[in-house]
Structure formats: C-alpha cells, structure tokens
Amino acid sequence: MGKITDISELEYDFLFIDTPPYLSNHLPKLIQIADLIIIPIKSSYLDLLAIQSTIDLIKSESKIDQTLVVFNMIKANTTLTIDILIGLEEYNVKIANTHISDLVSFTRSVLVNGVKSDKNAQKQLDNLTKEILSALI
C-alpha cells in the first residue's frame, strides 16, 4: 500500500477521490495535494450547515482558492438555491456557474448507461466539465 503523498506521482491526468469529510482521517493530506477540490452541495439548509466544517478544513490547509462548490440535485421552480447561495457568501468560496438539476435522467443513468438521450442533462454535464477543466488550467 502506497502513501497518500505518492498520489501525485501516479501517471493519471485526473484522479477523483470521493469521500465524505467525516470518513477520512487522511483528508488534510488529500487537500494539500489536490489541484482542485470540488464540494457538491444540495439546496438545503442542512447541507449549508454541513459544508462549514469541510470549508474550515480546506481553509486550514490554505486551499480555498482551489475549491469549487457545485450545486447538485437542484429542484426546479424553488427559491432554495438562492437562499443557499446567499448563505454561502460568508464562506468566500468560488461557486460553479453550472448547477446540476434533479432530473430523472440522472437517477436513471445507472440503469441505462448514462444520460445520452437527455439533451438537458448532457448539456449540464458538458458545461460543468468545461468549467472544471477551465479551473484546472
């Protein structure tokens, strides 16, 4: 088993590590070596409260400038997203322009091998991909 610090030596263009902040005692080391930290958030007050400890940890590692908050599972025709955006202002963290909607296509994607048949879902993923790649360049 290698060390976390060896990750940057791996021959990959992209490496995604998906973990809830409370499950990894290695999170500070992972944050230190990350080129970009993506924090998904739903439009809920509980998620807004839960994100604070993650952002505090990222700030303690001086990586807030390499952090991007991405809204996920956004409900249509609600003001919740605006409320959460206002709540996030105090954290002084970059928020992705692309929001991922709560579309049935995303839920079904595991069963049908993607979202190719839903142009709206595909457009959201394409836009988010471009935004992430731009943040890395």
Stretch-by-stretch model annotation:
Residues 1-16, 21, 110-114:
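P-loop/Walker-type NTP enzyme "switch/lid" segment
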Residues 49-72:
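Conserved C-terminal guanine-recognition region of P-loop GTPase G domains, centered on the G4
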Residues 43-45, 72-77, 116:
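Short histidine/acidic/glycine/proline-rich micro-motifs that form metal-
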